[in-house]
């Protein structure tokens, strides 16, 4: 519920505040386990104004992805990168977890990856998942701005 309240507040319309919220969530997990979380957010990515739907969906995509990396993939390292090139916001989350085969998951009809894809589609973003057994996972979201 607090995520929805945060997303609808007009004061939180900057990408910088969204990235800070993602980092705060990751920090909570980092304190609970041996998890090394590193974020690299380019200045240009911090200066974007995002609408409520964009903030909510991007935040929830990466909140779920960070949680999954921690709980299911048993990752010990998570890297979060964001950049903006003038018309495209690109956000990449990668981990060193055990990975999985995205083709063998029930991602379209079930939860998990299906939710991530649905959230990206709702805001006109593209979501790409690259993963393989014992090779970690990389989730990339690109959003035209």
Q: Where is each model-derived feature located?
A:
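ATP phosphate-binding glycine-rich loop and adjacent ATP-lid/helix-beta elements
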Residues: 104-135
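A short beta-strand-to-loop micro-motif at the C-terminal edge of the catalytic HATPase_c
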Residues: 83, 130-136, 142-144
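Glycine-rich G1-box
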Residues: 98-99
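Helix-loop-beta hinge of the Bergerat
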Residues: 16-54, 121
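Flexible helix-coil linker/loop segments in the cytosolic histidine kinase module
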Residues: 3-15
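Conserved ATP-binding N-box helix of the HATPase_c
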Residues: 55-78
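Short beta-strand/loop element within the Bergerat-fold HATPase_c
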Residues: 77-87
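Acidic ATP/Mg2+-coordinating residue in the GHKL
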Residues: 95
């Amino acid at each position: 519920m607090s995520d929805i309240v945060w997303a609808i507040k007009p004061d939180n319309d900057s990408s910088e505040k969204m990235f800070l919220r993602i980092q705060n969530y990751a920090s909570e997990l980092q304190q609970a386990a041996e998890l090394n979380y590193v974020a690299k957010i380019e200045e240009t990515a911090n200066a974007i104004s995002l609408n409520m739907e964009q903030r909510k969906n991007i935040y929830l995509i990466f909140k779920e992805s960070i949680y999954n990396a921690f709980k299911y993939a048993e990752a010990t390292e998570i890297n979060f990168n964001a950049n903006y090139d003038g018309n495209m916001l690109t956000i990449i989350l990668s981990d060193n977890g055990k990975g999985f085969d995205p083709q063998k998951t029930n991602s379209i009809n079930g939860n998990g990856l299906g939710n991530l894809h649905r959230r990206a589609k709702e805001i006109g973003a593209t979501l790409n998942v690259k993963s393989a057994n014992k090779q970690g996972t990389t989730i990339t979201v690109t959003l035209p701005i």
